[in-house]
Amino acid sequence: MNQLVECVPNFSEGRDKGKIKQITDSIEKVSGIQLLDIDTGSDTNRTVVTFVGSPKEVEEAAFQAVMKASEIIDMRKHEGAHPRMGATDVCPFVPVSDISMEECVGIANNVGKRIGKELDIPVYLYENAATTEGRKNLATVRTGEYEGLKEKLEDPDWKPDYGRTKFNVRSGATAVGAREFLIAYNINLNTTDRTYANEIAYEIRERGRWKRSGNTNPFYYKGDVVHFEEERYPDGNSNFIGSSFDELFEHYKKTTGKDLRERYLSLGLDPE
């Protein structure tokens, strides 16, 4: 079986179809690459692209996409509901077949090094590629977002893994990582009051409440709340990394007594 790697870069552009096409064209120009999915969001002003190929093909396609994004996206003008810190916000590599997580970590390092050296964009390695335990969680790495990046880069504790500590005002910074498949579980609430969504998120999100009185064994998921102006509802979202859909369905069944298969809309790609 041939080695197959998936890359799921997130770009800080979800409204200009011309710019999005320039990025996806740069990916498809790399021989052997299969572009599988393009998911754009106007409120988030963000596009998630999924493509697969051999390790070398994916390495090159990922770098070309980051380079194109750095040319056409100006973070000084970016506005959107989703947390972000760079033109290419995140660029994870996922082992699909006949390749190990360690090899994907190597790919993340190769791409991260090129981004830092050739594009002068600060790079932070996260998840399985993280160089310290404190950088494994993407939410932690992205704390402060683009607006707080200049100050963050001045902190010795946040020296980039690749690239200079100089603030790239146009492109921001990029998080490059290696991880298992991720299931993003989003819940739309039947209310325009964000308070309810915040309360739910505080209880289940990984960073959670500042203080959990009497709760010595809380459960955590990576989560946040995003308010979509177009649809006029708050959206609670949780990320399950390395999980299967069966585990997610079972969790929903236990907590609600209902079958999630009858109540959800699937977007993107099924890891199977």
What feature does the model see in each segment?
Residues 1-272:
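Long, contiguous binding/interaction regions
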